[in-house]
UniProtKB/Swiss-Prot annotation:
This is Uncharacterized protein MG406. It is a multi-pass membrane protein. It comes from Mycoplasma genitalium (strain ATCC 33530 / DSM 19775 / NCTC 10195 / G37) (Mycoplasmoides genitalium). The chain crosses the membrane at residues 12-32, 39-59, 90-110, 113-133. Disulfide bonds: none annotated.
């Protein structure tokens, strides 16, 4: 999977996720403005945004904080970070619970669930797509920087 210690790439992946989410939000807003009766879908789609921002910030900050620790402290902190890394996905349950509890006319539950699943699934897809692309480009760059060195095997006998 993707190495989240690379903050530059982690920021790019997070930005791609939010741009895709914003694109879908604009499409839903256009549909709501043209039809005028699906406001609950718009609110349902927007409900998980604060929780997704919190989750993305925790990914970026946890990786840099964990990388700054020394090896001895890393071994002690692994169990805590494993729990916290798993627990941050529980944050995504909060908007779904809110959409179930609040009157269905305000938040569309299906739109909330789809929007809630949008962030972690797109995060996983981009992480697994990014790794082969990064590997391909690193190999491409390293092949272009190689210089041909004659070893003597290619010379013909006189």
């Amino acid at each position: 999977m993707f190495n989240w210690n690379n903050r530059k790439v982690a920021k790019i992946i997070t930005l791609i996720i939010f741009v895709a989410w914003l694109f879908v939000l604009i499409l839903i807003a256009v549909v709501v403005l043209t039809k005028g009766n699906n406001l609950d879908i718009l609110f349902g789609w927007m409900l998980p945004l604060p929780f997704a921002v919190l989750n993305s910030l925790s990914v970026l900050r946890l990786a840099s904080f964990f990388a700054s620790l020394k090896n001895v402290k890393k071994q002690k902190a692994v169990s805590f970070f494993a729990f916290f890394f798993t627990a941050r996905y529980l944050i995504y349950l909060i908007p779904v619970i809110i959409s179930f509890v609040v009157t269905p006319s305000i938040f569309n539950t299906i739109a909330t669930i789809i929007s809630t699943l949008f962030f972690p699934i797109l995060n996983l897809v981009l992480s697994f797509v990014w790794l082969p692309l990064e590997y391909f480009f690193i190999n491409l760059i390293s092949k272009s920087k190689r210089k041909h060195v004659a070893t003597g095997d290619s010379f013909k006998r006189n």
